Swiss-Prot record:
It holds the Pfam family FecCD. The gene is btuC. Gene3D superfamilies: ABC transporter involved in vitamin B12 uptake, BtuC (1.10.3470.10). One of its GO terms (cellular component) is plasma membrane. This is Vitamin B12 import system permease protein BtuC. The keyword Protein biosynthesis does not apply.
Amino acid sequence: MLTLTRQQQRQNIRWLLCLSVLMLLALLLSLCAGEQWISPGDWFTPRGELFVWQIRLPRMLAVLLVGAALAISGAVMQALFENPLAEPGLLGVSNGAGVGLIAAVLLGQGQLPNWALGLCAIAGALIITLILLRFARRHLSTSRLLLAGVALGIICSALMTWAIYFSTSVDLRQLMYWMMGGFGGVDWRQSWLMLALIPVLLWICCQSRPMNMLALGEISARQLGLPMWFWRNVLVAATGWMVGVSVALAGAIGFIGLVIPHILRLCGLTDHRVLLPGCALAGASALLLADIVARLALAAAELPIGVVTATLGAPVFIWLLLKAGR
């Protein structure tokens, strides 16, 4: 038994090391790749100072943090709701951020600065989170809370569709592209949004013990003494914050929160002491690679990163499911 435990620990360490190396390679490639390839030896030239440090570095940091936040949010939701299909958009938080953004554009008549739009997106996500917490205070079961989130997401999606359909504003129509996900407008002015993600990410990565209890199921977690009401509220609030900030930075990006945790579980990473940091590393790496493809696929334009993640990730996910089912 002890030998099996040590073998599992060594395998977990190897996985984390491999994911760390993959993320470092993706970081280097993200800084080098673009319309002009800039090798590391040219990073401190005048051309490198402009393209690498002023344009590519803030974008790379945003992609890294958003990828980690979405993947960890997916892992948290899948444990909280005991559902492998749970993901950050499931509770309606992503759509709530979109409603906040569209409301800001309508009320501000397209004159609000980007930082104000970002704040409105976060506010929309937090409003949906507060509504969910209101439901949670009534001590609803996990399945009922999940259904409440799905219903809120449908309502927010309908509101966005109505607003965009009847709008004649060019800015509002351009938001449809933004809601498909993209990091094209990210620079150092959005650094406050990046900093807002770091404390929550680090805190959740340290909560492996309650997450392992939640993964056993609601009844087992209660029997082990876990205060379900407290942890449900805290985790829903933390997830709402991370998703709201991520949508404010890059729009709605699918696939990462759904598939990354599931892929790691198929690979044998079930302990949240390893799964949570593994999700952060794998989510960051996957989104960095998708961002590179989005930048380089077309010569005169940039693809929405949400389209890239779905196109590249869905076949891989299906292949892994078929492989696991054999």
